[in-house]
Regions:
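Conserved NB-ARC/NACHT P-loop NTPase core of NLR-like innate immune receptors
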Residues: 1-410, 425-427, 437-446, 477-482, ...
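Extended alpha-helical scaffolding segments used for macromolecular assembly and cargo binding
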Residues: 412-481, 487
Length: 525
């Protein structure tokens, strides 16, 4: 029964390649949080509040690891805008409940009967989810646990993140032996949630970007010394880099760990000498105060680093090449769920080798696995923020216009479906149910490409977020509905994603109503 529970895969702390804090760094904040996790007389909620790049997720990973080692971790959910389910508020409580049920048999005994009679709990209100999936089983089982929720600001539901905090405020007092550790940027919707009277009184707030700069700089200096020593050893460089250069890199980081980490990734190149790349970093423009003193502002230095990496990778200005760059990098940034290079190539109608070569040239900004079947993701959420802001990404070759790129992705999805979908492409026997086909997954893997799977499940999402000229899209939609609709439903059924068909059609109707409003009647028909 538990395995049939709809939940977010890969959301727990032990999944993925997240790293915890380097030993000896972030000691003040870690000590405060860990003291809180062990004292159940203290507030039941802890909000680690910090700007982008200040290291919230790394700290959350460390807290989860330490809580697990201490036998206190009940469950964890690391939100990510890169994945549909991990960026949805409605998957948080079901996923936490699944983990709690596997850890605590007494919790499982109270949860399973409820799931048997309520299999669609993911579609219910957040209040019902928390009350039935979390609070009641925890209270009845009398469990003591710490629950970690990282990057709440990355949830992108229609309802604001404050909705889940409102639910937490009303119910958390019913489970006094359970603590919630939450991280997130200080965005208005999250700040609003934590200002609710019930939650405000129950929350310990730690503002990460208010830590004394000397403490942060010392931690970044320790990190740089450790990582660059390892890098120098791998590249057989003696006496490199100098202490002065490490100090300058620390200064340029301006308190942002993401700057230091990205710099190390940039220096550790397979195709360039680290010494040469370090010279590039140290020659990046500096800003000065009115008194003429050098100063480094966090976002300015990070933007300068991102832009320099991109400009070093793509030195020639060619409109045709620039279009390919935008298409590939924009796909990495805006896909609903990340794809491997082959899937990106399929949607963009490009050679997969061309995609791999381009992505490899900026791998310091990405999570790019040597295994070509693994999805490509931005290394840090601040990179998509940079690319999609025209005031920050001042080189128009790299600026990603969300609406235009979503339109391009919608066209790519519809084109792939119109070109590739065929009825009974999985060669099912007549009237066979999915459960009758023993090798169903093998047929899906061999006959439905990664790009086609993505297109079938996500075309409507890109369509509703698109902007631009839609005439060509109308013809693609017409072809899809007239000729490929049944084949699309077959694929969704094989992917166990038929719920998505209703959502897709509802979004399509709403989108058509919106874009056709004001058109001549004959045209809109």
């Amino acid at each position: 029964m538990l395995n049939n529970c709809r939940r977010a895969r890969g959301a727990a702390y032990e999944h993925g390649n997240r790293r915890g804090c380097l030993r000896g760094t972030r000691e003040a904040v870690l000590n405060e949080i860990e003291s809180w996790t062990k004292d159940f007389d203290k507030s039941p909620v802890f909000w680690l509040n910090g700007l982008a790049g200040t290291g919230k997720s790394t700290i959350a990973q460390t807290i989860a690891e330490h809580a697990f080692a201490d036998g206190l971790l009940g469950a964890s959910f690391f939100c990510s805008r890169d994945f549909d389910d991990r960026s949805s508020l409605h998957f948080i409580f079901p996923t936490l409940a699944f983990q709690l049920a596997y850890k605590f048999p007494s919790f499982r005994a109270h949860l399973v009967p409820f799931l048997q009679s309520n299999p669609d709990i993911v579609d219910e209100s957040l209040f019902n989810q928390m009350e039935k999936l979390i609070v009641e089983p925890l209270r009845l089982a009398n469990i003591t646990a710490v629950i970690v929720v990282d990057a709440l600001d990355e949830c992108k539901d229609d309802e604001p993140s404050s909705a889940i905090l409102s639910v937490l405020a009303r119910l958390v007092e019913q489970i006094p032996r359970v603590k919630f550790f939450i991280t997130g940027r200080p965005e208005p919707r999250i700040k609003t949630g934590f200002r609710l009277p019930l939650l405000k009184d129950a929350t310990n707030v730690f503002v990460l970007h208010d830590v004394h700069p000397d403490l942060i700089n010392n931690d970044i200096l320790l990190f740089l010394k450790h990582e660059l020593s390892e890098l120098a050893h791998r590249h057989r460089l003696e006496g490199w880099p100098s202490d002065e250069n490490i100090r300058l890199l620390c200064q340029r980081s301006a308190g942002l760990f993401v700057y230091a980490v990205t710099t190390v990734k940039f220096l550790d190149s397979k195709t360039h000498l680290p010494e040469q790349r370090l010279d590039v970093i140290l020659k990046l423009p500096e800003s000065t105060t009115p008194e003429g003193k050098t100063q480094f502002k966090p976002r300015t230095t990070l933007d300068s680093l991102y832009l320099s990496v991109l400009q070093m990778a793509f030195t020639e200005e060619d409109p045709e090449v620039d279009s390919v760059i935008q298409s590939i990098i924009g796909s990495v940034v805006l896909l609903v769920n990340p794809l491997p290079p082959s899937g990106i190539a399929e949607l963009a109608d490009l050679n997969p080798r061309q995609v791999v070569l381009l992505l490899t040239s900026i791998e310091s900004l990405l999570i790019l696995d040597e295994d070509p079947t693994q999805p490509v993701k931005p290394f840090h959420k601040s990179f998509p923020d940079f690319l999609t802001d025209p005031y920050r990404c001042i080189d128009k070759r790299f600026h990603i216009s969300r609406g235009n790129l979503h339109l391009q992705l919608a066209i790519g999805c519809l084109t792939v479906m119109n070109d590739s979908l065929e009825q009974n492409s999985l060669d099912f026997p007549d009237y066979a149910l999915n459960s009758d086909v023993i090798d169903l997954q093998a047929r899906v893997d061999s006959r439905i490409s990664v790009g086609l799977r993505y297109a079938c499940q996500s075309w409507h999402s890109h369509l509703t977020m698109s902007s631009g000229h839609f005439w060509y899209v109308f013809s693609l939609i017409g072809c899809f509905l007239e000729e490929k609709f049944l084949a699309w439903l077959e694929v969704l059924s094989a992917l166990k994603a038929t719920r998505g068909a209703v959502v897709a059609l509802e979004k399509l109707v709403a989108w058509l109503d919106e874009v056709c409003f004001g058109l001549p009647h004959k045209t809109s028909q």
